[in-house]
UniProtKB/Swiss-Prot annotation:
It is an enzyme of class 3 (hydrolase). Transmembrane segments: none annotated. CDD domains: 6PGL (cd01400). It catalyses: 6-phospho-D-glucono-1,5-lactone + H2O = 6-phospho-D-gluconate + H(+). A motif (Microbody targeting signal) lies at residues 323-325. This is 6-phosphogluconolactonase 3, chloroplastic. Expressed in roots, leaves and shoots. InterPro entries: 6-phosphogluconolactonase_DevB, Glc/Gal-6P_isomerase, NagB/RpiA_transferase-like, PGLS. It comes from Arabidopsis thaliana.
Length: 325
């Protein structure tokens, strides 16, 4: 079966013994936003929304790290959207780890599995607290199913590989079963690899590992963890590229990426936006303009501005990334 390629390769290439020997292992949100009130000390008191649809609020019990907490809701949708701004990147990753671990606990208890999608780039570094105590010992890693929102069509031991990045910094440090790590078949062409990955996802839907969104018919991942480029791209969906408008396919190939390597595969926006929870993690002043454009939705809105979620979208920003808001 076509789907077996994805599963077999996820097993073969998730184990370090099967990697090649040369792979080295060891004024925005008008009218309906909420913003924190600054305390007189060096700490900040943030507000969060407990039920955005009703407008009710509560004080957050954690006033240690957040500089601001903003919230809004999409008109006509139940989706919740939060923007969390942190004084230091280190504090951001602490809260991101708790956010991820809490969702893992929720879905493992509710459905016996936790489907997680990651991007490449700086996002993987932001997951570093998950491989430390207490999470490395408390998370039910055996129930995780691990995917990539996009991948470069290169060997898995190549420096451009999102698989290698995730393996070196994350997968090699946690006991996710190798068969639950879904890597692409990089021996195929970009187009064939995209088709193979989509077939793999459909098989997981048929076996009830992946849910399907009742509203869109696309796969519904439990958590999508995304980074954003300085140009506002997410996954391998770049500003002005036609793939941003793809509305039918789950996974597509790209052969003309403006960033090398040129050949990649990527989830489409309907798949990304059908996720239950999405975290968009952005750090650094070099991305501040794209953050501003994505959240204010003015001018040429970058792809990141098109990201949504069925249950909750959370932007995790450090102060430099939020400096133009």
């Amino acid at each position: 079966m076509a789907s077996s390629s994805c599963f077999l390769r996820s097993i073969l290439f998730s184990s370090p013994t099967n990697l090649r020997s040369n792979h080295h292992l060891p004024t925005f949100f008008p009218k309906n936003y909420l913003i924190c009130s600054h305390s007189t000390s060096s700490r900040f008191e943030s507000l969060s929304v407990s039920s955005i649809g009703t407008g009710s609020t509560k004080k957050s019990s954690d006033t240690r790290r957040k500089v601001k907490s903003m919230a809004t809701t999409n008109i006509g949708k139940e989706e919740k959207k939060r923007v969390e701004i942190y004084d230091l990147e280190e504090n951001l990753v602490i809260d991101l780890a708790k956010f991820t671990a809490d969702l893992s606990d929720k879905f493992c208890k509710e459905r016996g599995a936790f489907t997680v999608v990651v991007s490449g780039g700086s996002l993987i570094k932001s997951l570093r607290k998950l491989v430390e105590s207490p999470y490395v010992d408390s998370i039910d890693w055996a129930r995780w199913h691990f995917f990539w929102v996009d991948e470069r069509v290169v060997p898995k031991n190549h420096d451009d590989s999102n698989y290698k990045l995730a393996y070196d910094s994350f997968l090699s440090k946690v006991p996710i079963p190798p068969g639950n790590v879904y890597a692409i078949n990089e021996a195929l062409s970009a187009e064939a690899a995209a088709d193979d990955y989509e077939t793999c996802l459909k098989h997981l839907v048929n076996t009830n590992i992946l849910r399907v969104s009742e509203s869109t018919g696309f796969p519904k991942f439990d958590l999508m963890l995304l980074g954003m480029g300085p140009d506002g791209h997410v996954a391998s969906l770049f500003p002005g590229h036609g793939l941003c408008n793809e509305s039918k396919k789950w996974v597509v190939s790209i052969s003309d990426s403006p960033k090398p390597p040129s050949e990649r595969i990527t989830f489409t926006f309907p798949v990304i936006n059908s996720s239950a929870h999405v975290a968009l993690v952005v750090c650094g002043s070099g991305k501040a303009e794209a953050v501003e454009a994505a959240l204010k939705k003015t001018g040429n809105v970058p792809p990141a501005g098109s990201v949504s979620a069925e249950d909750e979208l959370v932007w995790f920003l450090d102060k430099p990334a939020s400096s133009k808001l």
